[in-house]
Amino acid sequence: MAKLNYASNMSLDGWTEDSSGGFNWAPPDDDVFVSITELMGSAGTYLYGRRMYETLAVWETDASLANRSDLTANYARAWQAADKVVYSSTLAEPLTTKTRLERDFDVDTVRGLKATASGDLLVGGPNLAAQAFAAGLVDEVALFVWPIILGGRNPALPTDLQLDLELLHEHRFESGVVNL
């Protein structure tokens, strides 16, 4: 059975977005980027909400991103190689290949996907992840904690659940980012 993993960048105070909804508070860091690329490459299927999907679709729709460096080319290859399931009630059609749309996050369907997938699944985006956490579907969490206090919005982790977790890994990057 495949694992369903959740990965997210977050500020020290637990937010994924700044107060205006932006992500650019996490400046480029090559070592962190390599680690995230390896994590992305370890999954065969990504589960996204519409907003996260639209943010990341550029890794397939904008060839200039992949051409910037070997690091970005590797990330683009990993992203494009994976199947994507996008949960959206408003998106009319996929923006990328290897992508299917689902109107609702159905717990039984995701359980079935975990049971039949040949590779692990990676859920991206805190809102969709909160649904997976609430259903008891998340097997592992990978957080990249940036040394910044945002006072932002959109918490990286559900605020209405208590879960006992086991620390499997920790790594501190030279930039101060900590991967848990």
Go through each PLM region and give its residues:
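Enzymes that bind and transform nitrogen-containing heteroaromatic metabolites
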Residues: M1-L180
